Design a protein with these regions (language model features):
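Extracellular adhesion/carbohydrate-recognition regions
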Residues: 1-48, 91-92, 117
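N-terminal regions immediately upstream of nucleotidyltransferase
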Residues: 111-113
Length: 121
């Protein structure tokens, strides 16, 4: 099923809906930080979370359309490596490159990846 991607001004982000998923990706400027810092930064936030690898891959798959929606509505384009919520052992976590949608392993405490949160609807 091709996802429905639409602008949602109330949540100030891009809403993405498929048969299995329904979430909004934050339109605010992305921050660069380590995975450990990202987890601490959003700890306790009930609404906005780090995305899963699957959610980031879906964003990467439709990045052209998503970036166009963000641009015309005052958001910032999504480019580069973005941290997922998923760990890869004790020292590493997964990030996804928006250029190809592939997941790569980065050191949690030293590698600076972009952070963009999602809210599951």
């Amino acid at each position: 099923m091709k996802p429905t991607i639409k602008w949602n001004a109330d949540l100030y982000g891009v809403e993405i809906q498929t048969k299995d998923q329904h979430f909004v990706i934050d339109a605010n400027p992305s921050m660069v930080m380590t995975w450990n810092d990202a987890v601490r930064y959003f700890e306790g936030n009930a609404e906005w979370k780090l995305p899963t690898i699957e959610q980031l891959r879906l964003v990467a798959q439709y990045i052209g359309k998503i970036n166009m929606l963000l641009r015309v509505n005052g958001g910032y384009e999504i480019r580069g490596f973005f941290w997922s919520s998923e760990e890869n052992g004790k020292l590493f976590a997964w990030d996804v490159f928006m250029g190809d949608g592939e997941a790569y392993s980065g050191r949690k405490n030293t590698f600076g990846g972009y952070v963009r949160t999602v809210s599951v609807l």
